[in-house]
Each structure stands twice: as structure tokens, then as C-alpha cells.
Regions:
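Elongated, amphipathic alpha-helical interaction scaffolds
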Residues: 1-308
Length: 308
């Protein structure tokens, strides 16, 4: 996983959309039943209608109910590492543009902050001293304001992975790290994703070498789990590499076999032509070699066989 916060959170939300909404927008997630489906809106679907500046941080998710009990709902999720880069006006423009593009008023904007946004407004109101003509607000999730101790045993994988980003006393740093690792082990069974999100935990935990040594001493089970993640991921990678290598080797072998078969067939055809020329004409070896593409030595050997 690259050390790009925007991409890290995009991957996280796209891999676990329900759990992401449960953590980042619990007031909305409370109304989602098990039948709802999550569909990420690809950037390709938006580029023709929206400016590229809208596509850097935003993650649109379309929520639908197959039985039609509720109208589709569009979530717009932004992640900001630097609160200073957040613009509520930009989010409002983007939300309105998506509403127009998808012909819906059912849009829920959500912003996830990795640092406390001291100056980021929670809403904007356009109007004058007499009337408000446009009011826009959004759901804001400030990770460092969430109490990490409340999520130590959470069944929500997104919450467990984000424990290092939450608020906790310094003495709990390694316990927070260990809980995130245990959550990854118990809540995600895919080895590829285990390795992928172990890196996510490491990026945000900021464990130095001394702390890692203490962690390995005090949390041996979790340290062994981390080693197991990496080893299984590497073993699967080697197995995939071996299978791909065998397949490529087989394909190359078949291709080479066909080439060799064609070469043998062509050579046998040249020998047959040379034999006919020897039997039916007085041509010498050099002339036959020129006409058939055989070497003079091959022509002479063929002539010797005919004589025998």
C-alpha cells in the first residue's frame, strides 16, 4: 500500500464500504439494512461532466435497495490529511454537481479528517440578514477526536484499522497497535488484504524501532500474527509466480514445439525435393543445395544414402 493517505483511504472505503459508513457516518449507517448494495462510482463516469479537481479526494458511493423499498442514496466521502486543504464550498459544489448528474436530491456528504480541523466550518449559509437562501452542511468524522479505548474490541474492521488514528493516552500506544492487528486477524480472512492492511496499520501507528522491540516482547502473539501475515502473503505470491511460470513455460513449449515441427516438415520437404532432383536430373551437389536451401554436406549425405 503506497504511503499516500488519499489512496489509502480510498482503498479502505472501497474494500469495506459498509464498515466505513458505520464508523464515519453512524447516524446514516443506522438506517442501512442488510439488503443494501454498494456501488463505487468510477471516475470515468464523472470526468465528462465534472472537473478533475473534484476527483482527487472524493469517493462517491451509490447505495441501492434491490427491492425498491427506498430510493437510491448517494454518499460523497472526502478524506483530508490536512484540514487546511478542505473547502466546504468545493464540497457543496461537488455535491450539487453529483445531484444534478444523477438526477437525485438524495446526497449525503461525509468528510473524514485525520487531524482536528480547527478552522473548517461545519456548514455554510448563503443569504442576507433577512433570509437564508442556501444552507449546506455535512457529516464530519474527526478521527483524532474518537476515543480509541471504545473501539479496542470493535467488530468493525475499519474502526480497528483506524485505532492508531484515534485519540488515546500515550501509554496505550502499543495496546492500540496490538488491538488493530488482532482485529485484522479476526475480521479479515483474505491473506492479500491482511498483508495490505497490515501496512495500513504500520503507516498510521508510527512505531519506531524501540517500540517495535517492546511490542515483540509484550505482545508475542500479535507479533507472530504479523509475521504469519507476511509469510502467508509471500508464500501465496511464490505459488502464484510458480503457476504463472509453469503456464508461461507450457505456452512457450507448445509454441516452440510447433515451430520445431514446422522446421522439421520444411527440412523433410527440402530433402524430398533434393532426392527427386538427384534421381531425375544430372545436377551436381552445389546446384541442388542452392535450389533447396540444404547444405552441400546434407546433399552429399543424401546422395550416399541413395547409392547404398
Amino acid at each position: 500500500m503506497p504511503d499516500s493517505h488519499d489512496q489509502n483511504f480510498k482503498n479502505l472505503i472501497l474494500d469495506y464500504p459498509r464498515q466505513a459508513l458505520e464508523l464515519f457516518a453512524p447516524e446514516e449507517a443506522a438506517h442501512l439494512d442488510d439488503s443494501v448494495t454498494f456501488t463505487p462510482i468510477r471516475e470515468e463516469q464523472l470526468k465528462d461532466r465534472l472537473s478533475d479537481r473534484f476527483l482527487e479526494l472524493d469517493i462517491p458511493l451509490l447505495l441501492e435497495w434491490p427491492d425498491g423499498r427506498r430510493e437510491a442514496l448517494l454518499f460523497v466521502i472526502e478524506q483530508h490529511t490536512d484540514p487546511g486543504s478542505f473547502s466546504v464550498h468545493k464540497l457543496a459544489r461537488y455535491s450539487l454537481s453529483l445531484a444534478e448528474l444523477f438526477d437525485t436530491d438524495r446526497v449525503v456528504p461525509v468528510v473524514v479528517f485525520l487531524k482536528s480541523p480547527r478552522r473548517a466550518p461545519e456548514q455554510i449559509v448563503l443569504g442576507n440578514e433577512f433570509f437564508d437562501y442556501l444552507r449546506f452542511r455535512y457529516i464530519r468524522c474527526v478521527l483524532p477526536e474518537l476515543p480509541g479505548e471504545q473501539y479496542l474490541e470493535s467488530p468493525n474492521l475499519v474502526a480497528r484499522l483506524n485505532l492508531p488514528n484515534m485519540h488515546w493516552p500515550p501509554e496505550l500506544k502499543l495496546a492500540i497497535y496490538a488491538s488493530a492487528v488482532r482485529g485484522l486477524e479476526s475480521l479479515e480472512g483474505n491473506p492479500d488484504k491482511q498483508a495490505k492492511y497490515l501496512e495500513f496499520i504500520d503507516i498510521y501507528a508510527h512505531i519506531d524501532n524501540n517500540e517495535r522491540m517492546l511490542f515483540e516482547q509484550n505482545y508475542r502473539k500479535e507479533a507472530a500474527t504479523m509475521t504469519g501475515f507476511v509469510e502467508r502473503h509471500e508464500a501465496i505470491g511464490k505459488e502464484k509466480g510458480l503457476q504463472e511460470g509453469l503456464q508461461q513455460g507450457l505456452e512457450r513449449g507448445i509454441e516452440r514445439g510447433l515451430e520445431e515441427g514446422m522446421e522439421r516438415g520444411q527440412h523433410e520437404a527440402r530433402l524430398a525435393t533434393a532426392r527427386n532432383l538427384m534421381l531425375k536430373t544430372p545436377m551436381d551437389n552445389a546446384t541442388i543445395a542452392d535450389l533447396t536451401g540444404l547444405s552441400e554436406a546434407e546433399v552429399q549425405a543424401l546422395r550416399n544414402n541413395i547409392r547404398d
